[in-house]
């Protein structure tokens, strides 16, 4: 079959983008042709992929999205496909991969009423309704149990159109047999002594991921503990505002900001704790990547995958609603207790052996390839 995938932006380090790539490659592995429509493509194009970057420009993102939809529709009219799979919400999809939460719910609960008069709101509300309305034919790949009831509440989407997928952690994130050697080499490279503690926070979109909360928690540590603790923040974002916050808090060389990179498994093995106090997070793939690497996790409860950390007993989950003081206390407790960290690491590795945390691409491909076009 000829399959078409559409997403607004591809870059190698985004969670949505990595999920797209693994699903598309799985469909290709099963013998199907892959075409991709996008506004921005950064990185290599896999052999056999046809990638089409829309030649459209607009002042506002929502207008650019609409132009992409129109340009794609015109191309599909000339060169039809058997399935159209979207990783952002838009009209005309056969299958939608629900990487993002419910826009309408956020608009009603987190925004004031004036927001709903803007063109931006109308665009995203209309595009979400095109996917989730009862009369829509789009099948929905869900990766978060938390969001499904919200879509049903706002749109009355029939239950049978939802397909809940298991997580899709890449096997290269699992701790290898030589994990101790990799950890030692990593810590030598970054000049980390045995008594120093390394926190990592990983993910693009520093504001949403709660980097400000992490910096406050680091600054609140007792002086002797703070002196031997470092934080590395890794992701595709402009760190300027957080660098200013870090300086204002007197953290100096204790904090490093690094761009998104392909050797994340080394950081998961070399660190002592993953901190992830996100404001909102549909899933949080990095939580499970840490779990399967044997890295203890400190996470906010709003993250869709936070329940895995609790089930595996591989770290601590903050209460909801979030309180900075609890984050400060939990961080201090986790850093001071070497025995507990070792136990959380063992628990994560044991959970990684028994739970299905890996088969999302295969399950997604099953749904995509099974759908008959309306």
Name each model feature, range by range:
Residues 18-22, 197, 201-220:
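A conserved mid-protein helix/loop that constitutes part of the nucleotide-sugar donor-binding site
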Residues 39-41, 202-206, 229-243:
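Glycosyltransferase donor-sugar binding loop
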Residues 120-143, 149:
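Membrane-proximal helix-turn-helix segments that form the acceptor-binding/catalytic region
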Residues 242-260:
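Nucleotide-activated donor-binding/catalytic signature segment of Leloir-type glycosyltransferases, i.e.
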Residues 279:
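Aromatic "clamp/platform" in nucleotide-sugar-dependent glycosyltransferases that forms part
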Residues 296-300:
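Short hydrophobic beta-strand element within catalytic cores of glycosyltransferases
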Residues 340-354:
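A short, well-ordered alpha-helix in the C-terminal region of glycosyltransferases
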């Amino acid at each position: 079959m000829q399959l078409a995938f559409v997403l607004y932006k591809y870059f190698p380090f985004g969670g949505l983008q990595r999920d797209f790539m693994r699903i598309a490659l799985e469909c290709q592995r099963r013998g199907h042709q892959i075409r991709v429509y996008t506004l921005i493509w950064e990185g290599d194009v896999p052999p056999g992929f046809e990638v089409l970057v829309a030649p459209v420009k607009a002042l506002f993102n929502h207008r650019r999205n609409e132009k992409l939809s129109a340009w794609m529709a015109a191309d599909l009219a000339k060169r039809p496909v058997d399935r159209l799979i979207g990783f952002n919400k838009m009209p005309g999809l056969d299958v939608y991969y629900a990487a993002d939460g419910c826009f309408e719910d956020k608009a009603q609960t987190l925004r004031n009423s004036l927001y709903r008069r803007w063109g931006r709101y109308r665009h995203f509300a209309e595009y979400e309704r095109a996917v989730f309305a009862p009369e829509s034919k789009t099948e929905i790949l869900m990766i978060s149990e938390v969001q499904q009831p919200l879509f049903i509440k706002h749109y009355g989407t029939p239950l049978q159109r939802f397909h809940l997928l298991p997580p899709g952690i890449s096997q290269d994130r699992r701790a290898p047999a030589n994990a101790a050697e990799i950890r030692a080499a990593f810590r030598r490279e970054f000049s980390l002594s045995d008594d120093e503690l390394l926190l990592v926070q990983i993910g693009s979109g520093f504001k949403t991921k709660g980097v400000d909360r992490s910096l406050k928690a680091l600054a609140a540590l007792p002086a002797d503990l703070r002196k031997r603790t470092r934080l590395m923040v890794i992701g595709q974002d402009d760190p300027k505002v957080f660098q200013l916050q870090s300086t204002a808090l007197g953290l100096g060389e204790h904090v490093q900001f690094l761009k998104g990179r392909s050797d994340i498994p080394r950081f998961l093995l070399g660190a002592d704790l993953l901190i992830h106090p996100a404001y909102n997070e549909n899933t949080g793939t990095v939580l499970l990547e840490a779990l399967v690497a044997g890295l203890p996790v400190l996470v906010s409860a709003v993250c869709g995958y936070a329940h895995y950390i609790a089930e595996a007993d591989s770290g601590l989950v903050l209460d909801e609603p979030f309180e900075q003081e609890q984050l400060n206390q939990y961080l201090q407790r986790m850093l001071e207790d070497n025995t507990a960290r070792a136990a959380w690491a063992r628990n994560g590795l044991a959970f990684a052996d028994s739970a299905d945390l890996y088969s999302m691409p295969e399950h997604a491909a099953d749904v995509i390839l099974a759908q008959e076009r309306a």
